[in-house]
Amino acid sequence: MHIDHAHVHGHRIRYAVRAGDTSRPPLLLLNGLGANIELALPFIDALDAPSVITYDVPGVGGSPTPPSPYRPSNIARLTAELLDHLGFEEADVLGVSWGGAIAQQFAFQHSSRCRRLVLAATSPGALMVPAQLPVLLKMLTPRRYVDREHALKVAGDVYGGVFRRKPAAVMHAFDHVRFSSRGGYYMQLAAAFGWTSLPWLWTLSQPTLIMAGADDPLVPIVNAYVMQWLIPDARIEILDCGHLFLVTRAEESARIVESFLTESAESGLRRGRRAASRVPSSPLRRMS
């Protein structure tokens, strides 16, 4: 995997490219809160064919903390400019957790550049069914990334799945953590504040795969079903795992994603036509 830096949208961004099948669009991976490139390596390594692009958000990993806050729309634009820098017109986009918000924003804001969309362990943002308050409070600090004892203590409560039974497994999952700064972490939190995709999810035209963990304390599974109902051409896959299934179930997750990315356009179109009847008009109009 090639790692380098680029100046895009006013930021110096650390990015990575894993070479793969050049006959298809690359998979653009948008990571979660405080998560640097290397945290996604188990999933990237499990993928067989596609080229993969991922990067550290400003203030995370090897990307310097910016002097001022940003919004998801800014990061979506940064993402588009990174694709320009790398010479790609379009990509399949996978967003996990916080990165799922950016993936939704990118698919909406730059729809012609997003061929297929994968939303993993994520939600529509502020207008979601939230986690329980103790879980949310644990996420307000990046302490789990820098304090191993604290990570062991909170892993099961925050991430669920295997970490409830084996908290020490979080040490393996966090082997590649490259924590940058508290400022960068809090900027990510601030970017998500007040953001929601709920009013426009029904406009997304991309075939969409929604993946959720059955035991995800951070993003309750009902949010996946809400997104499936609102996005016209969406399917859902539930994994018997917690929030970090892309890491803890990397092989299984990779098979599901690759199957979705390589299915025929005809089958996706047929499914889209069937699904479109579920959302005939804006959900805001239906609520009025």
Where are these regions (language model features)?
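Conserved alpha/beta-hydrolase "acid-adjacent" motif
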Residues: 217-223
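Active-site loop/oxyanion-hole signature of alpha/beta-hydrolase fold enzymes
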Residues: 54-94
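Short beta-strand/loop motif that positions the catalytic acidic residue
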Residues: 204, 210-212, 216
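Conserved alpha/beta-hydrolase catalytic His-Asp/Glu region
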Residues: 128-130, 148-200
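Catalytic histidine-centered segment of alpha/beta-hydrolase-like enzymes
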Residues: 241-254
